[in-house]
């Protein structure tokens, strides 16, 4: 059966039995299959699972999470049944600082965060790659649905074959230096293939559901953020674009740009959240046309391929976005760029990522400022 599931060699100049591969295991089906597949192909697999949160008992009970409690046990159980070593590293303090606190502070700036990108950018890639080097391993392998294509020494990050599972949006902050050591063996398969492989390898987690939403949010977003930043639930005013008071809100944590439901305002036309003014603790609302825009400013740029001035690309403005045609332009501000969409787009949210593609290839991107 394994002949149906061929993958690119992890390294061109070494045989599998000569290659030590660190596999980041979350306890889910994807990373477990990646580890089992490589082990069966003869690679020296070492499984590593990060304990990221949940030792206080608050976060690890939610179904569909990862990297805590049951998931760590599942990863260890897979390693034992397949027959490769497995280690658990406690990264709770780093995760709290780099991801959870950033999540809360981003909300407090009136933005909508994507903690999964920050986690990949810092804990999972930056820190795990250092672990990979410290252990004298050749590569770091993950179960992400994304493809790494290498030709003539040039490495490209591309969308997964399975577009419904593609995770390239969440990996835009990966650097060329990191890609030298990273490998994504599942990018050329469909999720249904991975389920088949899980059963073929007799993995106990073959029917385990996919992880959903943000792993450390055990309750609602608002309740989680309220615990991290109590000031986010202070009452304030809801005003229109001219400053007229229309009502009162119970905390900015309950709102995000583009939101319509839950405003609690009776008005002669539908109103949407236009902006969250954290300085005045105000939620600014207005008609839908105010939320339609073409020009986007992005910061903290990461280019896997440096775009030329006015380069035509397709951009994704949220993970579920199919993509919009746009051009990329330089600005006078350091480490910022301007993206001009061909057509108006509704509800562009500061704090989200703007990821640029050239066909299937990820060019790079940045965080939306405005």
Curated annotation (Swiss-Prot):
Compartment(s) where it occurs, according to its Swiss-Prot or TrEMBL record: Cytoplasm
Function: Catalyzes the 2-thiolation of uridine at the wobble position (U34) of tRNA, leading to the formation of s(2)U34.
Species of provenance: Wolbachia sp. subsp. Drosophila simulans (strain wRi)
EC numbers, comma separated: 2.8.1.13
Site (described: Interaction with tRNA): 144, 352
InterPro entries, sorted: MnmA-like (IPR004506), MnmA-like_C (IPR046885), MnmA-like_central (IPR046884), MnmA-like_central_sf (IPR023382), Rossmann-like_a/b/a_fold (IPR014729)
CDD domains per the UniProt record, alphabetical: MnmA_TRMU-like
Name recorded for this polypeptide: tRNA-specific 2-thiouridylase MnmA
Family assignment from sequence similarity: Belongs to the MnmA/TRMU family.
Active-site residues, Swiss-Prot/TrEMBL: 119 (nucleophile), 215 (cysteine persulfide intermediate)
A GO cellular component annotation in the UniProt record: cytoplasm
Binding-site residues for ATP, renumbered to this chain: 24-31, 50, 143
Cysteine disulfide partners in this protein: 119-215
Lineage, top ranks: Bacteria, Pseudomonadati, Pseudomonadota, Alphaproteobacteria, Rickettsiales
Principal localisation: cytoplasm
Region spans: Interaction with tRNA: 165-167
Keywords assigned: ATP-binding, Cytoplasm, Disulfide bond, Nucleotide-binding, RNA-binding, Transferase, tRNA processing, tRNA-binding
GO molecular function: ATP binding; tRNA binding; tRNA-uridine 2-sulfurtransferase activity
Matches recorded under Gene3D superfamilies: Adenine nucleotide alpha hydrolases-like domains, HUPs, Translation factors
Catalyzed reactions per annotation: S-sulfanyl-L-cysteinyl-[protein] + uridine(34) in tRNA + AH2 + ATP = 2-thiouridine(34) in tRNA + L-cysteinyl-[protein] + A + AMP + diphosphate + H(+)
Alphabetized Pfam families for the sequence: tRNA_Me_trans, tRNA_Me_trans_C, tRNA_Me_trans_M
A Gene Ontology BP annotation from the UniProt entry: tRNA wobble position uridine thiolation
This protein's record includes keyword Transferase: yes
